[in-house]
Amino acid sequence: MGRFIFMSFGLLVVFLSLSGTGADCPSDWSSYEGHCYRVFQQEMTWEAAEQFCAQQRKESHLVSFHSSEEVDFLVSITYPILKADLVWIGLRDIWNECRLEWTDGTKVDYKEWSEEPECIVSKTTDNQWISRPCSRTYSFVCKFQA
């Protein structure tokens, strides 16, 4: 009996010490490299998701990625929760930034882009980025600095 109590106490100490590793993040957020992340299952447009993130915490936005390790972390927390393929990330309007050229070398002097802006989703299985109309609805991940 004394051994059981000792083991239980030891496990409690380990649990409490590990729970402090993400102490700068709220309990329902995950911690990685000084940032807090939370997966939201509800589906929203890109703009609504970004506004929702901003309402959750000061300086919170749709997730941004800055290393392959961060992506691996995001995949590890996103896919098990959503079991979905695509989530909004904090990129949009990439076509306005691209340098376009025709394969024959002529100048791009005529453009017929859709009126609707494009935003970016990430595949939760392998982090491939895909542009989608911002008006579509997807789940999303919010991020803020701890």
Curated annotation (Swiss-Prot):
Subcellular localization, as worded in the UniProt entry: Secreted
Provide any one GO MF term from the record: toxin activity
PROSITE patterns of this UniProt entry?
C_TYPE_LECTIN_1, C_TYPE_LECTIN_2
Tissue specificity remark: Expressed by the venom gland.
UniProt entry tagged with the keyword Transmembrane helix = no
Primary location: secreted
Q: Which UniProt keywords apply?
A: Disulfide bond, Hemostasis impairing toxin, Secreted, Signal, Toxin
Domain named C-type lectin: which ranges?
32-143
The UniProt record lists the keyword Ion transport? no
* GO cellular component, as recorded: extracellular region
Superkingdom field = Eukaryota
Tell me where the signal peptide lies. 1-23
Q: Which cysteines are joined by disulfide bonds?
A: C25-C36, C53-C142, C119-C134
Q: What does this protein do?
A: Interferes with one step of hemostasis (modulation of platelet aggregation, or coagulation cascade, for example).
Q: What else is known?
A: Shows greater sequence similarity to the beta than alpha subunits compared to other heterodimer snaclecs.
- Similarity annotation: Belongs to the snaclec family.
What's the subunit arrangement here? Answer: Heterodimer; disulfide-linked.
Give the protein name, as stated in the record.
Snaclec 1
List the source organism: Sistrurus catenatus edwardsii (Desert massasauga)
